[in-house]
Amino acid sequence: MKITHITTYRLPPRWMFLKIETDEGVVGWGEPVIEGRARTVEAAVHEFADYLIGKDPARINDLWQVMYRAGFYRGGPIMMSAIAGIDQALWDIKGKVLNAPVWQLMGGLVRDKIKAYSWVGGDRPADVIDGIEKLRGIGFDTFKLNGCEEMGVIDNSRAVDAAVNTVAQIREAFGSEIEFGLDFHGRVSAPMAKVLIKELEPYRPLFIEEPVLAEQEEYYPRLAAQTHIPIAAGERMFSRFEFKRVLDAGGLAILQPDLSHAGGITECYKIAGMAEAYDVALAPHCPLGPIALAACLHIDFVSRNAVFQEQSMGIHYNKGAELLDFVKNKEDFSMDGGFFKPLTKPGLGVDIDEARVIELSKSAPDWRNPLWRHADGSVAEW
């Protein structure tokens, strides 16, 4: 079997799919994207095509190494996201050829189900109580929300109180009947992160995500030393080599590699194993589409340290398409009591509605994340 063609489709709301075709008619799908940089990743995918056309898709490890090492300059969000989507599609092909789901090819299940959590609120958290109430009605009991709006390097008590009050209202409304994580999105400086973590401790959030930017990773162990709240990060780390540094340094309780950013299934399975060796939990990042989610689920079901799975149903970014709008076998992604079950169809287990993909790709938006500014006019972290 040989790879014959690679096609990319930019899609609403902010996704990109790719299709790898073979000379035997077997097709694999992947989801390579950096949110807000889809065109750039698309260009990288087609550059990698030169290494892939005419090659055997079954040699996933070798093709991964070629894409990663054949270029003197490597790594980073664009290259690793392109590799990620290609890698997903190669695993999809292998599973279809062998008539087995990807988790079966990776040694089989370590669990029967995995808890999912749902987003509530928006970029600036609002209507959180109502959002939680609605989602509880369809089985969710675990949630994530943005922990604050933009925050200055040294900000005032009002900004701190606004963040804390949202969390206090959640606990007052629901007590211990639900759990929630707080995503600070790297919006907070290290000095303000120390203040916020101290103030939030009594409300026992499930985790605090990206309290500082990934490039300030030296603060993770310092912040962890002052709190009992688990600290999570990883969506802006792109290979096992970046995760190696934070695991060695300590501080993170939960790793959140993104299966569409960090080299795909091949790389993230290695990252999951590294995390387990350090007694660190795994919770793959996935505010993206169905192929990315499927890839995450296969990793979850073969990784003992996986604890819960993000998914984008109803997330505030989903304008123009919802999580399963491009999927024919929607029933396979249904949740029972807030849990996903293993996908059982061969490959990734996603039956893509290709006609709908082609149609909506003709008018795909060029999504960009908001540009925020502080009151003084300086650029704020989004």
Curated annotation (Swiss-Prot):
Keywords: Lyase, Magnesium, Metal-binding
Transition state stabilizer (site feature) positions: 310
Sites marked Increases basicity of active site His: 258
Cofactor(s) needed: Mg(2+)
Note describing how the cofactor binds: Binds 1 Mg(2+) ion per subunit.
PANTHER family per record: D-GALACTONATE DEHYDRATASE (PTHR48080:SF2), D-GALACTONATE DEHYDRATASE-RELATED (PTHR48080)
Name listed for the protein in its UniProt record: D-galactonate dehydratase
